[in-house]
Amino acid sequence: MPLLDSFAVDHTRMQAPAVRGAKTMNTPHGDAITVFDLRFCIPNKEVMPEKGIHTLEHLFAGFMRDHLNGNGVEIIDISPMGCRTGFYMSLIGTPDEQRVADAWKAAMADVLKVQDQNQIPELNVYQCGTYQMHSLSEAQDIARHILERDVRVNSNKELALPKEKLQELHI
């Protein structure tokens, strides 16, 4: 099985909260697609609660689009990581990490403005696979956690696992 990009970086050295440009590729028509690692938690030390990350998934997708789309950028998807330490965001365009960090902080401020669980988009049996597994208060705790800390940039070059380590891990 090929080594995926997300596993070629040293998770023991990742900072959080932090933005990392995980991958950039071009479509056959020449459009740039960029994937960002939006790391909310320090891997293997912190984790977002399942109800909070689920609610954040519903809110974050819209709020990030409000703050990042435009000027050559259009978000394709924002999805939570299975490890519950962050989200992956795929988009058309190549915004720099600071632009993404600024949009992320603005989106977290928007999460704090949501006053009632009924304001969570698509929170119903028809549009959500586990519509009862939500917590606005947990999502807002996550947002506060981001806003209370400085959003940094994680560098692929600094986090790259050396070839020797990959061989040691039998990859």
From Swiss-Prot:
GO terms for biological process: quorum sensing. Its cofactor is Fe cation. Keywords: Autoinducer synthesis, Iron, Lyase, Metal-binding, Quorum sensing. Fe cation binds at residues 54, 58, 128. GO terms for molecular function: iron ion binding; S-ribosylhomocysteine lyase activity. Its EC number is 4.4.1.21. It catalyses: S-(5-deoxy-D-ribos-5-yl)-L-homocysteine = (S)-4,5-dihydroxypentane-2,3-dione + L-homocysteine. Binds 1 Fe cation per subunit. Involved in the synthesis of autoinducer 2 (AI-2) which is secreted by bacteria and is used to communicate both the cell density and the metabolic potential of the environment. The regulation of gene expression in response to changes in cell density is called quorum sensing. Catalyzes the transformation of S-ribosylhomocysteine (RHC) to homocysteine (HC) and 4,5-dihydroxy-2,3-pentadione (DPD). Homodimer. Belongs to the LuxS family. NCBIfam families: PRK02260.1-2. This is S-ribosylhomocysteine lyase. It comes from Salmonella typhi. The gene is luxS.
